[in-house]
């Protein structure tokens, strides 16, 4: 106590020798942990010589946290660098080859394959090509339209109208003719000029009819053939051409 009081007195003397103090005086009789000063009760202060207990606790707390983090890091490094061992049937430990170790990605992939359901896609048979498959699908979806078949008995030739034979009576052939119509020059049924000239020449009676020729007027009625003709008659090389306007008939001997 004497030393403490003497120290306080010395400090009081040194402070009294200094000029007037402008700092406010805090009259406290307990220790101030924040400023580190001890009040003497008379307005004078003294520096603390010892670290307060709260500061020591704070330092220990942070030190313990730092040491625990460092120990954890060292343990992890040692664990990772330690060789992988596995027990054998004899109880001894043997090293595992690095190739046999399963990586994390492979392990995750195996777990996913085991949990996710396997979806199977339908396989297309190799025999059926894509084009054949498309045609089969179209045949199944589109309605089948059947075309009516023409019977084989009806041939085109049977449908053609037959031309009347020469044995039929001539009157029935010429009865279908109509009255001749005036044809325009250059039309389809127009007669060429040289045929008209020959027709005009033949229509004229011969000037001198020889008596040696047969007289058709004196022939019996059974041998005569009288046919009503409505149209132009052309005789060329023993062939009779009858132009009835709409139709033309050719009679050969």
From Swiss-Prot:
Keywords: Host membrane, Membrane, Transmembrane, Transmembrane helix. It is a single-pass membrane protein. Residues 141-225 are annotated as: Disordered. Residues 141-158 have a biased composition (Low complexity). The chain crosses the membrane at residues 62-78. It is found in: Host membrane. It comes from the Viruses. The keyword Transmembrane applies. Coiled coil: none annotated. Residues 200-216 have a biased composition (Acidic residues). GO terms for cellular component: host cell membrane; membrane. The keyword NAD does not apply. This is Uncharacterized protein 037L. It comes from Invertebrate iridescent virus 3.
């Amino acid at each position: 106590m004497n030393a403490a009081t003497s120290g306080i007195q010395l400090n009081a003397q040194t402070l009294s020798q200094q000029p007037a103090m402008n700092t406010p005086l805090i009259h406290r009789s307990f220790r101030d942990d924040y400023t580190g000063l001890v009040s003497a009760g008379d307005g004078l202060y003294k520096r603390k010589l010892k670290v307060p207990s709260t500061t020591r606790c704070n330092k220990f707390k942070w030190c313990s946290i730092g040491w625990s983090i460092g120990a954890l890091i060292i343990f992890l490094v040692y664990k990772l660098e330690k060789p992988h061992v596995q027990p054998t049937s004899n109880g001894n430990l043997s090293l595992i080859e690095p190739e046999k170790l399963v990586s994390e990605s492979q392990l995750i992939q195996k777990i996913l394959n085991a949990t996710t359901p396997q979806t199977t896609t339908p396989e297309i048979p190799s025999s059926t090509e894509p084009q054949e498959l498309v045609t089969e699908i179209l045949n199944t979806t589109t309605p089948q339209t059947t075309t009516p078949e023409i019977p084989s008995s009806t041939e085109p030739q049977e449908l053609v109208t037959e031309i009347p034979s020469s044995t039929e009576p001539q009157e029935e052939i010429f009865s279908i003719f109509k009255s001749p119509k005036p044809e325009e020059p250059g039309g389809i049924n127009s007669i060429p000029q040289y045929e008209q000239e020959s027709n005009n020449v033949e229509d004229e009676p011969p000037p001198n009819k020889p008596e040696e020729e047969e007289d058709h007027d004196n022939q019996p009625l059974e041998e005569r053939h009288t046919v009503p003709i409505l149209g132009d008659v052309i005789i060329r090389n023993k062939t009779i051409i009858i132009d009835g306007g709409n139709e033309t008939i050719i009679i050969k001997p």
